[in-house]
Design a protein with these regions (language model features):
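Structural/interface elements that position substrates and couple domains in central-metabolism enzymes
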Residues: 1-278
Length: 278
């Protein structure tokens, strides 16, 4: 990556990385000790896939990263969870680090990301908001300094408790998934009554209270975030004894959507897919 090789595809990312490496603002290293000891803030940005068998988020990589960071802390450091994690993970990360390094001077903050694949650079430069969950003014000041370049865009910076920040991410994704699921069910109704779902969505979206984003009927939501995040939120709610019937319905409706769409495709092709390219 230091020489310009980017392991993922994101439009414009290679140029941004190359320019900042050349300017000396960005560097890459595999030396954990050197990186952590020089840092005022260390971000944990690792995968949190759905755990096989029970639907909960797998936090193995998060806790391993916390242990690796703990081994190399030197001076006051803010450890920031950037990964999408269930409520209470920040407290667990703090416990992991404290157990490994009782003498360490650190805070744990939650700073969820809201980037969209394909427009991540623009979303980072002009975010709707920056959410930071932490409990100390010292940590808040470090996070303010990190995001100060965005202040010229008047980006709202919301400071909350850790648990609130963690839940904001899950609740946001669940709400967007709900909009997608809602318009899909309206699309099914449109087919029955002879209405055009595109016109219905357009008429709904012009209401500023609703907005037009995520009102596009289709095969349901997918990708790397919405399915695992809605399921993780549902599992967290169930574990806490909280009722989230809307989220449960969204997950169930979306799961049923894909086979239903497959049946519609088959019907449109005369009921037989053998030998056909879809």
């Amino acid at each position: 990556m230091q020489s310009g090789g980017i392991p993922i595809f994101e439009p414009g990312l290679d140029a941004v990385v190359a320019a900042n490496v050349k300017a000396g603002r960005l560097s890459f290293t595999g030396d954990m000790a050197a990186a952590v000891r020089k840092a005022e803030a260390v971000f944990i940005a690792v995968g949190t896939p759905t755990r096989r068998g029970d639907g909960h988020a797998d936090l193995t990589y998060v806790f391993q990263a916390a242990k690796d960071i703990a081994d190399n802390l030197d001076g006051y450091t803010v450890v920031v969870t950037k990964s999408t994690v269930p409520v209470g993970t920040g407290r667990e990360v703090q416990d992991v680090i404290r157990a490994a390094r009782p003498d360490a001077d650190f805070d744990v903050a939650s700073n969820p990301e809201f980037l969209r694949e394909g427009s991540a650079i623009e979303d980072f430069r002009r975010p709707d908001r920056v959410v930071v969950g932490c409990g100390s003014e010292r940590a808040r000041e470090v996070m303010r300094e990190i995001y100060r370049p965005l202040f010229i865009n008047e980006t709202p910076m919301l400071f909350t408790g850790r648990e609130s920040a963690e839940l904001i991410k899950y609740a946001s994704n669940a709400f967007l998934a709900t909009k997608i699921t809602f318009i899909n069910e309206i699309a099914d109704l449109c087919e029955k009554v002879g209405a055009d779902v595109k016109d219905v969505a357009r008429g709904m979206g012009l209401d500023k209270r609703i907005g037009s984003k995520f009102l596009h009927a289709g095969p349901g939501f997918g990708g790397s975030c919405f399915p695992k995040d809605t399921l993780a939120l549902l599992k967290t709610s169930q574990a806490q004894g909280a009722v989230t019937r809307i989220v449960e319905a969204v997950v169930n409706v979306n799961d049923a959507r894909k086979p239903a769409m497959a049946r519609k495709i088959a019907e449109a092709l005369g009921g037989e897919l053998t030998g056909k390219t879809v």
